[in-house]
A protein has these predicted regions:
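N-terminal phosphate/diphosphate-binding loop that engages ATP/GTP or pyrophosphate donors
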Residues: 4, 29-86
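C-terminal accessory "lid"/substrate-recognition subdomains
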Residues: 100-104, 145-239
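Short, hydrophobic beta-strand segments that form beta-sheet elements in well-ordered domains
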Residues: 105-109, 120-127, 142-150
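Phosphate-binding/switch loop-helix module in NTP-utilizing enzymes
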Residues: 81-113
Length: 239
């Protein structure tokens, strides 16, 4: 089982091909890293036959033999390759894999998987104001943090930013992360998957766990700690 240490904030940069999504991702990563935040990214590649591995390589032979995951370690890099069909992988699984140890996970693409998820903020990259207004009226993406594109737009309920204004978008994201840090977080995992919890359940679970922990010898509880509960060995655990 991979470590389910999900990022505090997940942001999906979505939009049509050729609109500049990667440029926006680059700008956000640089700006957030400059603020001291840990940032991870994930990129959706639509090509069916795409693979980082190569037939005949030792790592490829490991996978062909049936290894669930193959980790390749070199002096300057560690890569892990897992084989599965994207339709078999829920978005939560992708997030769990991609965001280990990070404050923010930025995903490029994944429109169909993340487009309507309320726990994933969307930055929609467009070709112009007209496209932004059309997308806003269609309700294809929710919630939208901002549109990014050329020109200026009026009448939108969310900010419309130019490519040179990505820094201000990073400021908003950083503030959200800092607020989440300040209040602490509570998460419940069954196997590799995170179970959605409402605010009331989070608070009750947190109080129970911290109250129990405070009774243990040598444990000093402040009350603002993050709480993560892992239940292992669930049916369907993918490793």
């Amino acid at each position: 089982m991979w470590a389910p240490t999900r990022a505090r904030l997940v942001v999906a940069v979505v939009g049509e091909k050729g609109t500049g999504k990667t440029k926006v991702v680059e700008g956000l990563v640089r700006a957030l890293r400059a603020k001291g935040l840990k940032v991870c990214t994930a990129k959706h590649v639509p090509e069916e036959d795409f693979s980082l591995d190569r037939p005949g390589k030792d790592s490829w032979r490991h996978a062909e033999a049936g290894a669930l995951a193959v980790t390749i370690v070199s002096p300057g890099e560690i890569d892990t390759i897992r084989r599965f069909r994207l339709k078999e992988a829920e978005f939560d699984d992708i997030v769990a894999l991609a965001s280990q140890g990070c404050d923010v996970l930025i995903v490029e693409g994944f429109s169909s998987m993340a487009g309507q998820r309320p726990d994933v903020l969307k930055v929609v990259v467009v070709r112009g104001p007209g496209e932004a207004k059309a997308i806003a009226s269609e309700g294809r993406f929710k919630p939208i943090l901002a549109f990014v594109g050329p020109g200026e737009a009026e009448g939108l309920k969310v900010p419309y930013l130019g490519f040179g204004e990505v820094g201000s978008l990073a400021d908003r994201i950083a503030n959200m992360v800092l607020k989440a840090r300040a209040k602490g977080d509570t998460r419940l995992f069954l196997g590799p998957r995170e179970v959605p919890l409402n605010a009331f359940v989070k608070e009750v679970l947190k109080r129970i766990v911290l109250a129990f922990a405070s009774c243990l010898k040598g444990v000093d509880i402040r009350g603002d700690e993050d709480v993560m509960v892992f239940i292992l060995g669930q049916e369907g655990d993918k490793g």
